[in-house]
């Protein structure tokens, strides 16, 4: 039996009764080949569960094999499972990913919006396709992932909470889950901080202990986003126009730019323009024009609120009365105090206490009451 002193210091010792109860439950742990899922599997073992791993392949390699880490990740996942003495299953969800995540991603970019495919991947793949496969084909009572979130309550009463580590909290990416999905899922590393996760992996001598966290969109990897997108969507160059209606340059394609962007606009050397940096403040999709203004505090960068649609509430009950809470309009943002005003069951108006910069249509607005993630929706427009 592998031993980790770090684990023993940070997790309570379970009673024999708790261990015996857990021993009747089978958990399929998603193994990505990273340190978080590796340590998650170990924690579940220590808590007495019957643990098996599952490696998901969600993207078929293309010509850029340098950028696709699937083979190396699978090898790492297998090495960890061998060390822990658990079985590793493998499944290919590439077709489901293409149909339910990637095509939506392209459609949104084509429409000039900035989607978040990781949120859609969690909704359609990790907590739908994976959950169904684990339960129906592998006989799982629960699935587990290496996400930094916590769960309170069971089954019908399950709530999604922020991860204990504020620097790693991933509840923003999981707001589309229902209370039933949360109730069927375990999040072992959500109860600890990232340095402790790495320390446990070091104690165990896991191959993933020092492995760098993956960054960026999973199907793009480390390659340049612009180069990748150009392979699937033909770029449509157009004018860069100022808020004062002056054309001052050309853009390569609206899809390559996002609200609040400062770098990479190629604007410079303009007479009477001053020294302040230029920022993207809007996209005119109809005329294929990028709208820019000078200064990080330009009024056009700010919104007093937003309209959100495609709503998902974790308890699946729509909000029908005004609610004071907090919101994040992008990952790792500080919570913004706000009031939700329902328009109908599918749409809400959100008014911030103070104007916010670079609120981006296509991104998600995720709402919180203290530690509890209530759910969220897609930003349809700025106010």
Swiss-Prot record:
Active site (catalytic residues): 121, 218
Region (Interaction with target base in tRNA): 116-118
Keywords from the named record: ATP-binding, Cytoplasm, Disulfide bond, Nucleotide-binding, RNA-binding, Transferase, tRNA processing, tRNA-binding
An example molecular function term from Gene Ontology annotations: tRNA-uridine 2-sulfurtransferase activity
Residue(s) at site: Interaction with tRNA: 147, 363
GO biological process: tRNA wobble position uridine thiolation
Record bears the keyword Cytoplasm: yes
Superkingdom field: Bacteria
Protein name, UniProt field: tRNA-specific 2-thiouridylase MnmA
């Amino acid at each position: 039996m592998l031993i980790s002193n770090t684990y023993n210091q940070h997790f309570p010792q379970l009673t024999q009764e708790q261990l015996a109860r857990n021993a009747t439950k089978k958990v399929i742990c998603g193994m990505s080949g990273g340190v978080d899922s590796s340590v998650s599997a170990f924690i579940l073992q220590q808590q007495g569960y019957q643990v098996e791993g599952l490696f998901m392949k969600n993207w078929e390699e293309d010509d850029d094999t340098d950028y696709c880490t699937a083979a190396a990740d699978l090898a790492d996942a297998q090495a960890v499972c061998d060390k822990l003495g658990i079985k590793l299953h493998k499944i290919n969800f590439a077709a489901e990913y293409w149909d339910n995540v990637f095509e939506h991603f392209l459609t949104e970019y084509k429409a000039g919006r900035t989607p978040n495919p990781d949120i859609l991947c969690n909704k359609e793949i990790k907590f739908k396709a994976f959950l169904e496969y684990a339960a129906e084909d592998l006989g799982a009572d629960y699935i587990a992932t290496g996400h930094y979130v916590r769960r309170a309550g069971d089954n019908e009463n399950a709530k999604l909470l922020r991860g204990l580590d504020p620097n790693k909290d991933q509840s923003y990416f999981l707001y589309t889950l229902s209370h039933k999905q949360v109730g069927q899922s375990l999040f072992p590393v959500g109860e600890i901080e990232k340095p402790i996760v790495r320390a446990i992996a070091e104690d165990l001598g896991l191959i993933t202990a020092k492995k760098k966290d993956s960054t960026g969109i999973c199907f793009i990897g480390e390659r340049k986003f612009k180069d990748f997108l150009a392979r699937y969507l033909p770029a449509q160059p157009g004018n860069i126009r100022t808020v004062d209606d002056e054309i001052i340059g050309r853009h390569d394609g609206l899809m390559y730019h996002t609200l609040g962007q400062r770098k990479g606009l190629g604007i410079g050397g303009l007479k009477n323009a001053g020294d302040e940096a230029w920022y993207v403040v809007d996209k005119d999709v109809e005329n294929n024009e990028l709208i820019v203004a000078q200064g990080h505090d330009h009024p056009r960068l700010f919104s007093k609120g937003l309209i959100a649609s495609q709503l998902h509430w974790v308890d699946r009950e729509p909000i029908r009365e005004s609610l004071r809470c907090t919101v994040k309009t992008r990952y790792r943002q500080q919570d913004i105090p706000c009031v939700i005003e329902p328009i109908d069951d599918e749409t809400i108006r959100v008014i911030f206490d103070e104007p916010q910069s670079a609120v981006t249509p296509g991104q998600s607005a995720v709402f919180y009451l203290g530690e509890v993630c209530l759910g969220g929706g897609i930003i349809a427009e700025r106010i």
